[in-house]
Amino acid sequence: MRVMNFSAGPSNLPDEVLKEAQEHLYDYHGKGFSIMEVSHRGKVFEEVHFEAIKMAKELYGVNDDYEVLLMQGGASLQFAMIPMNLYMGGVCEFANTGVWTKKAIKEAEILGVNTKIVASSQESEFDHIPQFEFSDNADYAYICSNNTIYGTQYKCYPKTKSPLIIDASSDFFSKKIDFSNIAMLFGGVQKNAGISGLACAFVRKDMIERSKNKNIPSMLKYSIYAENDSLFNTPATFAIYMFNLEMKWLLNQGGLDKINEQNIQKAKILYDVIDESNGFYKGHAKKENRSLMNVSFNIAHDKNLEPVFVKEAEENGMIGLKGHKILGGIRASIYNSISIEKVQKLSEFMKNFAKKHA
């Protein structure tokens, strides 16, 4: 019997996806070889690769103004690749809402980028998304749409004439997005759309043009990925195969609007328990910025009970609930593949735990 996995990532995968991958791990569609053994230049893998890209575009409904790039190195490599490819010598603006924006700012500064932090919520332990405006003449404006550690999430994206770059690693493929204001949307796929080792980026073609004249290594150049359909070198073939299965699974669930409905319902179940606990539990994020993906909270009644909560949860078949080492506390990551039923079981455990220890 499989446990209920509330880990922040790599995270829970849908049972249907795991079972299909298990079958194809040994014999791919009766061909006598594993999907892990196929050449990235062969017809079998090319079908998997291009189908994955097609489904990703279909899910978000993006037009041909965007290239879908599949790259190794996860989202963290993008912290360096973005300034390498898109910095034009002006200023790059950031909204600092957590660890991942801080890392993106640091990488840009290592590369000599003129950075400007237009807003930050660091003084309150990143418990909210601050109010701010980007200028309209930055080389790019940068946000992280969902902050995994602190449990905050943008409910709408800032409007700006500057190219808007969004790190969506932890709410990737969790809802429909209006791309009209977005120059680049990227993320590691290991939370909502696959396994670790792969980053997916939707990059507007005018941003691809910027990279063409950049004197940077080929493997770090967006235009090289675009010109070669993300097949310039041997890609992460198994991770792309898993990404393909996840895209198919999302479409079979009814697409991103349906997934978003379920995500809203799941988050409400847990936040209701927190809010109705008479102060036993306390959420970290301000209510207006609460994440649908990561529910971070403390046992305000007695923080010494938090390791007891995690231990007893594991004994009840629920893992991955220990908060990040930076923030501590408890965190339930309820990504796309976590069912409403599993969230309900966690909520019942939370209620019973509070009743027992109040």
From Swiss-Prot:
Pathway: Amino-acid biosynthesis; L-serine biosynthesis; L-serine from 3-phospho-D-glycerate: step 2/3; Cofactor biosynthesis; pyridoxine 5'-phosphate biosynthesis; pyridoxine 5'-phosphate from D-erythrose 4-phosphate: step 3/5
Names of the cofactor(s): pyridoxal 5'-phosphate
Location of this chain's protein in the cell: Cytoplasm
Membership in a protein family: Belongs to the class-V pyridoxal-phosphate-dependent aminotransferase family. SerC subfamily.
Keywords in alphabetical order: Amino-acid biosynthesis, Aminotransferase, Cytoplasm, Pyridoxal phosphate, Pyridoxine biosynthesis, Serine biosynthesis, Transferase
Signal peptide stretch: none
Descriptive protein name: Phosphoserine aminotransferase
S-S bridge residues: none
EC number: 2.6.1.52
Species in which this protein is naturally found: Campylobacter lari (strain RM2100 / D67 / ATCC BAA-1060)
Subunit field text: Homodimer.
Pfam family, one: Aminotran_5
Top-tier EC class: transferase
GO MF: O-phospho-L-serine:2-oxoglutarate aminotransferase activity; pyridoxal phosphate binding
Cofactor, free-text remark: Binds 1 pyridoxal phosphate per subunit.
PANTHER family found in the cross-reference section: PHOSPHOSERINE AMINOTRANSFERASE
GO terms under biological process: L-serine biosynthetic process; pyridoxine biosynthetic process
